């Protein structure tokens, strides 16, 4: 019986023998295609090959493509675990032809592979063709399929198109008949939705182009796109009707069972299936650079994670489980997908962190859900407001709540949920609008109507003439900004860069050409009206400015130069991080200001000193290389074809600006290709050497799964190093040491200080035990309620020393109770102890709570033999002792 790994290899090797190039799977995050959430089919990485934009050195390709369907219209999440063939992650086997072979070869290839290499009985196979595709019908007859098993289908199921317009064509599909013991009919029959006949391969004949009027013409370059689900064909070849019975899933399910100590094939099987499937999608997404977050791809990942974690909870798991299963997954799939092994530590850390955090709210959220359902009539849907509270307060995605309700035979009021979500967004918008942080956006569309789109000249010049076409003062259009007044100036053209893409806006001056003494100081520049209007925030330093005035606009050159250096350094930093940490690194945000740069990126843990050093050295290496920074304008498709990185969620027009820099000599791209290629609208240096130098200040956590690096370039970096050098000189002078000796000298001083602190602490404890540190309450033992009781107020003793003193007093007393109060700058630390023979009569917790209350504090807790707490007023120590005595005497 072949394993899934064997089946994958057989498929790829068959097509390699037929002249196909084996192309590695593309990442689950589509390269430079912000229109697509996840890679969901084999043809995604070849989209531009089919349109002729991407010219490759092969015309035949075969792949095993990683795919995820868990968002948007391709969303299998709700059904995963409950059916035999739904998955969030799956592998799509495919063969492709880009203008090379067509139907007469594609169909025989498929038939030979499945009947000879896979040895599937021919009498179990049916095929479908589009109802007008006589050519495909005849080819199927020629390879030996009886006419009775070739079914013409007139629906869109057998006609594929890339979109409303563009490449399209008929499909042919291959179905397997599992036998009459399973209900269902062949495709095209009334019973086709049954499980007897299962599609195992789809072949698309990309032969037409469709236009807006619905008409179609034949393409000059006819192509082939096929897809066969590995899990589905694997189940068939392993003699099963259920994908979860294949060798890979069995291994993952058994690992889940071992981790939870729950039978993998009993009543709880569905939970193991969910965990096994979701482990695959979450692990591969993390390996490909997606990290859990509250929006976009990261939120889809978090939804999948939390659904799996809830099913682990239903299995009774008290501790995080998912991260313990990654090793098994890597063992099963790491050979085929090496990126999984490279990212294993990151995957495990991310899963552990996310599961630990979610478990803190999972129990409370499920209790709220149960309480809400208990209060409802039987079978009534959960109100949308309650589902929204679970989402907003406890982090329950709506589909997780729906999944939990499904098991109880209940539903959720999704309209009510949507209404609650819309209400919250409306409140957030209102709060934002009232914050004073932004001028009402509507005014800028009025400005656009008046002034038109601004022509940006800043890539080529920092000084230009223009005309003030619109002025905005106090949120309204105005004809004039008076001397000393402030407002916004919009000109027909400008060299000022408007804040966007992480780069701050330019500053500078605007002068009236008619009277150059009339000067407006530009404090900021921004883009409004969907980026079409560039507005300058000004204060009139001298004179006034009127609508229609001819003006000269001049950018602050020194500031712009510093910003350019930081922005270019950010591009180099991005690539250096990817090389040092892995391809999972993806930009999550940035700030390119004049004085510093900040870069947020996906990574689950702090960088080591060695990694930080490597990243800094790599950036400086490319700065010293002094290579030319190139910018080109091209279509988004052309940009993607050359490997330019784009940000998911960014909107791109018909043309994009591509910034390239650095020539790789070692490591990634060592063949001399460009090292960094990104879609970017910002301003950059002309040569990487213009950055000067790069100093990495440190790495910190920005949010869950996102790290932040801050750095300096140019003069700021030089000044920082000079200051650090001066500080080091001061330290070496104080220590009378050479710079290389400083670390060891400081370490010795710290060790000495710690030893002295321990000695002082021990002396204080000895003094306290001898009675010398006592004040007020004394240290004599006396009986209260028949219990030997010692109470003492201590000064110069820290609260953390009290438990050790309690234990020593108890040991000396043999039997009794102790109350110690440490005066710490007016506040009090309290500890109480009771010997084991008396804990049935009196609890140290009760003594502490009484004392803490008298000291103006709240709470206090611990064990019957030892408890601690704190109070606000150490001056009330006598009252605290009396309160404890009342507990003993009561």
From Swiss-Prot:
**InterPro entries referenced in this protein's UniProt entry, alphabetically:** aa-tRNA-synth_II/BPL/LPL, Ala-tRNA-lgiase_IIc, Ala-tRNA-ligase_IIc_anticod-bd, Ala-tRNA-synth_IIc_core, Ala-tRNA-synth_IIc_N, Ala-tRNA_ligase, Ala_tRNA_ligase_euk/bac, DHHA1_dom
Q: Where does Zn(2+) bind?
A: 567, 571, 680, 684
Q: Which Pfam families match?
A: DHHA1, tRNA-synt_2c, tRNA_SAD
Q: Name one GO cellular component term.
A: cytosol
Q: How is the cofactor bound?
A: Binds 1 zinc ion per subunit.
Please provide the record's keywords in A-Z order: Aminoacyl-tRNA synthetase, ATP-binding, Cytoplasm, Ligase, Metal-binding, Nucleotide-binding, Protein biosynthesis, RNA-binding, tRNA-binding, Zinc
Localization per record = Cytoplasm
- What cofactors does the UniProt entry give for this protein? Zn(2+)
Protein role:
Catalyzes the attachment of alanine to tRNA(Ala) in a two-step reaction: alanine is first activated by ATP to form Ala-AMP and then transferred to the acceptor end of tRNA(Ala). Also edits incorrectly charged Ser-tRNA(Ala) and Gly-tRNA(Ala) via its editing domain.
Domain topic, free-text comment? Consists of three domains; the N-terminal catalytic domain, the editing domain and the C-terminal C-Ala domain. The editing domain removes incorrectly charged amino acids, while the C-Ala domain, along with tRNA(Ala), serves as a bridge to cooperatively bring together the editing and aminoacylation centers thus stimulating deacylation of misacylated tRNAs.
**PANTHER family per the UniProt record, alphabetical:** ALANINE--TRNA LIGASE, CYTOPLASMIC (PTHR11777:SF9), ALANYL-TRNA SYNTHETASE (PTHR11777)
Q: Which family does it belong to?
A: Belongs to the class-II aminoacyl-tRNA synthetase family.
Q: What is this protein called?
A: Alanine--tRNA ligase
